[in-house]
Amino acid sequence: MSKIVFIPLDERPCNYIYPDYIGRMSGLELSMPPKEMLGDFKKEADVEAVWEWTKGQVKGASHLVVSMDMLLYGGIVPSRLHHLPEAVCAKRLECLKEIKKLEPGIQIYGFQLITRAPARDGSGEEPDYYEDYGY
């Protein structure tokens, strides 16, 4: 049985629960961080805790499938709202090299969403200023 470490995009069921279901149906050992680490809507995940959790899970794993939005910014919505300096993001990205040192044979697959410009003026998933200055 292959062990896959999966870092989801965020805590929503389509990104957290469904992959777990698919893993179980497929007979894969799918390891995901506790949901509590992943933030909640506009509240970003505890990125450092997710990285530490990931480092502790990769031993013996064949693959790491990782949302770059999660591991760089703390989730999809926080990736749209962040004001992080480039140096912080670069430091977080360097953790992938550390993963490779911990488990040299692991295959790492990263994915990232492309930010969209919604055709509405709500601030629900967007920066608060969209309420007043949205599309």
Describe the residue ranges of each PLM region.
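An N-terminal assembly and electron-transfer interface module characteristic of large anaerobic redox
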Residues: 1-135
